[in-house]
A protein has these predicted regions:
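Flexible, solvent-exposed loop segments that connect beta-strands
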Residues: 57-61, 102-115, 154-156, 323-328, ...
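Surface-exposed loop and membrane-interface regions of Gram-negative outer-membrane beta-barrel proteins
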Residues: 83-133, 154-155
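Exposed, low-structure sequence patches enriched in small/polar residues
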Residues: 3, 47-49, 69, 126, ...
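Surface-exposed strand-loop-strand hairpins of Gram-negative outer-membrane beta-barrel proteins
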Residues: 47-71, 101-103, 115
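Surface-exposed extracellular loop regions of Gram-negative outer-membrane beta-barrel proteins
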Residues: 75-94, 174-185, 267-269
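Bacterial Sec-dependent N-terminal signal peptides
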Residues: 1-31, 173, 382-403
Length: 403
């Protein structure tokens, strides 16, 4: 009863918040903030995400947990001209009540073991060098911008990475034109030295979206293609490690219709998973999933209703709810399964660069069967899990000096 009381409150809460900011026709219409910075300017930039996340998960797919804390990234930003900019600072992650943090990337790699720890706060350096080749093209080195979750479909990217995982770091290329959007990045997560005790690890991602205006400012066709590749490898290591590469591919189509301030969308994605190499980390060598959905957007409020059907599928960066194996019961794998998925998001603009964000997710798992070595056939009735998060975003810059 308590779970459903919380659930009812959240649905009402997200729905009744007032909306003030103008909603863009497409969530692909992002801009590169660096291009708006005046040349020869030194700024102090603060990026803070104070969050409270509660994951009320039920069943044998994954554990429930809560995340109370903040991700604070203060930095100095300098624009040499309208083409080149540098940003350097430090990124700090704090979970309230936690006093010991393992020195590993805060992202899902099940084989990783931590061998060093920090006390009080998880702290890493932050650096970003950007070249604005044109107003529509940007190349960046160092930390990667993933504030928009790379616009990947929900089954491929867990929203929690945005504010709880370490900032991605490597190389990023972005293109944003009226009918084309491209976000390609390489996130280098583990560097190895000679005789190191862990493997070289990186993630490669690509999101390419083609947009076609059927009726200008009214009807738009969007064709997205996404790729996520994770690799474990390396040479001259102290230990016997296997080399393996996993990949997720998503291809889809979406139709957006705009009527005044309301945007209605209908679309579907086909997702594919593959493992190249010998490894016992993941349970499957290949799998698939389908993800049809409808979405309603009114200014800063979005509500999505989706159906998810999968077999032998592994989501590399997504929620465990989109995988065909259990993360809380060892060696339990599920047969072909399906579920209903609901997601609501809202952003309320408070001040220049400051906003209050809220999101809610519901996973309604239908009848589920699976296998676990040494046990009888697992048969479970449907169950409902949900999660919600509230985030206070402060993204603000102060001009220190203009040269």
């Amino acid at each position: 009863m308590k779970r459903f009381a919380i659930l009812s409150f959240l649905i009402v809460f997200v729905s009744v918040l007032p909306a003030k900011s103008q909603f863009c026709f497409s969530d692909c219409e992002t801009c590169f903030a660096d291009t708006a910075i005046q040349s020869h300017s030194l700024l102090f930039h603060i990026d803070d995400k104070s969050f409270f996340v509660d994951n009320e998960y039920k069943g044998e797919k994954t554990y429930g947990y809560s995340l109370p804390g903040f991700r604070l990234t203060p930095s100095l930003f300098y624009a040499l001209n309208d083409k080149i900019s540098l940003e350097a600072g430090v990124s700090m992650l704090r979970y309230h009540g936690a006093n010991r943090y393992p020195c590993v990337i805060y992202s899902y790699f099940p084989a990783w073991q931590a061998y060093q720890f920090l006390s009080g706060v998880h702290l890493i350096p932050y650096f970003r060098a950007s070249w604005n080749i044109s107003p529509a093209i940007q190349l960046s080195f160092g930390n990667i911008d993933n504030q928009n979750s790379h616009l990947l479909p929900e089954p491929l990217y867990n929203v929690e990475h945005t504010f709880s995982s370490d900032p991605e770091a490597g190389v990023q290329f972005r293109l944003n034109k009226p009918h084309q959007y491209l976000d390609a990045w390489l996130n280098w997560q583990s560097f190895v030295f000679a005789n190191d005790i862990h493997q070289e690890t990186f993630t490669l991602g690509v999101n390419w979206q083609t947009k076609l205006d059927i009726v200008k400012e009214k009807l738009r066709l969007l064709v997205p293609l996404s790729l996520v590749v994770q690799h474990l490898g390396g040479e001259n290591l102290s230990g016997d490690f296997s080399v393996c590469t996993w990949s997720n591919i998503a291809a889809g189509m979406r139709l957006d219709y705009k009527h005044n301030r309301l945007i209605s969308s209908i679309g579907a994605d086909y997702l594919y998973y593959n493992q190249a190499g010998e490894s016992d980390i993941m349970h499957f060598e290949n799998g698939w999933a389908v993800y049809p959905y409808i979405e309603l957007a009114y200014q800063k409020l979005k509500v999505k209703f989706a159906y998810y059907d999968s077999e032998d599928f592994v989501s590399l960066l997504g929620s465990p709810h989109f995988c065909n194996f259990s993360t809380n019961t060892p060696d339990l794998v599920f047969d072909r399964s399906n579920q209903f998925y609901v997601r609501a998001t809202y952003s309320y603009d408070i001040y220049n660069g400051c906003s209050f964000d809220a999101y809610f997710q519901l996973f309604r798992q239908n009848h589920l069967t699976g296998d676990r070595p040494g046990f009888d056939k697992v048969i479970r009735d449907g169950f409902t899990s949900f999660s919600f998060g509230i985030i206070l975003n402060i993204d603000h810059s102060i001009l220190l000096k203009h040269f």
